Amino acid sequence: MSKKKGFWSSLFGTDDSNAGSANMATERLKVIVASENRLNNRLTADRIEKMKREILEVVNKYVNGVQIDDVNINHRSEDSLDVLEMNINLPEHKK
């Protein structure tokens, strides 16, 4: 019987086909959110910290061992576009 891989399974290597891949566990999850509106007014330091905690809760539902220091969020402007970049360092996958 063939199994369809779910999004989270393929991303975090939770199915049998990815179980042997040590590199999968050390890769970063990168998410870039871009908005034509200015983010400065909406994203204060407090809101970014709250966002980090909420993201950490969701990630830890699928990958154990991610700490708040493993979540990095950066805001920068490029021309008329604001970019919010998030990097999450995942712990090593143990066999």
Swiss-Prot record:
UniProtKB keywords: Cell cycle, Cell division
Its job: Prevents the cell division inhibition by proteins MinC and MinD at internal division sites while permitting inhibition at polar sites. This ensures cell division at the proper site by restricting the formation of a division septum at the midpoint of the long axis of the cell.
Entry-linked SUPFAM superfamilies: Cell division protein MinE topological specificity domain
InterPro entries noted in UniProt: MinE, MinE_sf
Name of this protein: Cell division topological specificity factor
Parts of the chain that traverse the membrane: none
Species of origin: Psychrobacter cryohalolentis (strain ATCC BAA-1226 / DSM 17306 / VKM B-2378 / K5)
Gene3D superfamilies: Cell division topological specificity factor MinE
Keyword Cell division: yes
Biological processes per GO annotation: cell division; regulation of division septum assembly
Entry-linked NCBIfam families: minE, PRK00296.1
Family, as annotated: Belongs to the MinE family.
Pfam families, A to Z: MinE (PF03776)
Domain of life: Bacteria
